[in-house]
Amino acid sequence: MSGDKDRRLPFDRDREMITKAEVETDPRYGCPPEERPIEEYIMKGVINLDKPAGPTSHEVVAWVKEIFGLSKAGHGGTLDPKVTGVLPIALEKATKIIQTLLPAGKEYVTIMHLHGDVDEEELERVVKEFEGTILQRPPLRSAVKRRVRPKKIYYIDILEIDGRDVLMRVGCQAGTYIRKLCHDIGEALGVGAHMAELRRTRTGPFSEENAVTLHDVKDAYEFWKEEGWEEPLRHVVRPMEEGLEHLPRIEIRDTAVDAICHGANLAAPGIVRVEKGIQPGDLVAIFTLKGEAVALGVAKATWKEMLHADRGIMVDTKRVLMEPGTYPKAWGLKTPGE
C-alpha cells in the first residue's frame, strides 16, 4: 500500500520569510485579523464547511447567507450534490479571495469499484502510471466544453482494498474529474471501474481536519445573537487571511498600505519581508505587519530582486482587499523603527 508516504500538494512547500528591513507596526492602525470586532470579523470571514451529501453547493451557500443575514457569499469550488467534504465559503467582503481558491490544488478520498478481479501488484503499478500530467475529457454531463484538457495528478495513494472496492487518496489540479479518473484506471486495468463514493478532503489551505458542519455554524451564530458569546463563532468563521495561505507572501510597511488600498502598485521601498522563491508572474498576497490582507498582485521581480532593490515596481496590484483609510496616508506617518 502507498498510503503512508508523505504526499504534498504544490503549496505544501517549505516556506521561509526573508527580512529586508527591521520595521515595526503602529498599534494605532489596523489590527490582527483574529482581533477584529465581531461584525467586521464576520464580513471578512471564511467558513471551512464540511458539505453534507444531498444539497448542491449553491444551496449550501444560500443557507449560510440566510443564517447570517448576508447579501453576498461564495464558495471555493463546486461539489456535486452526492459529494461531501471541504467547501470553503467566503462571506461578504471575503468573496474577493474566492478566485484564488478556485484554481488551488485539491485532495479527494474516493472508492473506486472495479468491475473485475485484479492482482494487487498490477493495481498498484497501473495506478502509479496516472501520477503526473494526464489528459482528460470532461464527462458528458459536465457544464464545460468537452475538449481534452491536461491535468496534473500530484499523487494517488491506495489506502485500502476490500474485494473490488479500492479506497484511494488523490491529490490533483483543480478541475480534475475523479469520476473520469476512476473510469480511465479501470480501462487501463482491462476490467473497467467506476467511482462509487467521493469526498473532498482539501481545497487549497483548507482541510477536513478543521472543517465545520452547517449545524455548528447555526449554533455558533445563535450563541452570539442570543447570549453575546463570540468564541464559538470565531471558531467556525475564520479570517479571510487563512484563505490566502497557499499564496506566496509579501509583508509591507504601514506607510505603504494606504497607497495600495487606493490601487497603487507596490514599490521596492515599501517591502519589509518577502517569501523566498517568488518569481515574476507569480500571484502573491500582500499583508501588513499585523497579518492583515491588503491586496493580491502579480510579482514583477524575483524575491532576491525585491530584497535588494531600493526603487522600482515589484508587484502589480490586481485586487485590493483592504478599505482605504485603514492606515493613514504616508505623509505625516512614521512607524516605530523607521
UniProtKB/Swiss-Prot annotation:
This is Probable tRNA pseudouridine synthase B. Its EC number is 5.4.99.25. It comes from the Archaea. Belongs to the pseudouridine synthase TruB family. Type 2 subfamily. The active site is at 80 (nucleophile). It catalyses: uridine(55) in tRNA = pseudouridine(55) in tRNA. Could be responsible for synthesis of pseudouridine from uracil-55 in the psi GC loop of transfer RNAs. NCBIfam families: CBF5, PRK04270.1, unchar_dom_2. It is an enzyme of class 5 (isomerase). Keywords: Isomerase, tRNA processing. Residues 247-322 form the PUA domain. The lineage of its organism: Archaea, Methanobacteriati, Methanobacteriota, Methanomada group, Methanopyri. Coiled coil: none annotated. One of its GO terms (molecular function) is tRNA pseudouridine(55) synthase activity. PROSITE patterns: PUA. PANTHER family: CENTROMERE/MICROTUBULE BINDING PROTEIN CBF5, H_ACA RIBONUCLEOPROTEIN COMPLEX SUBUNIT DKC1. GO terms for biological process: box H/ACA sno(s)RNA 3'-end processing; mRNA pseudouridine synthesis; rRNA pseudouridine synthesis; snRNA pseudouridine synthesis; tRNA pseudouridine synthesis.
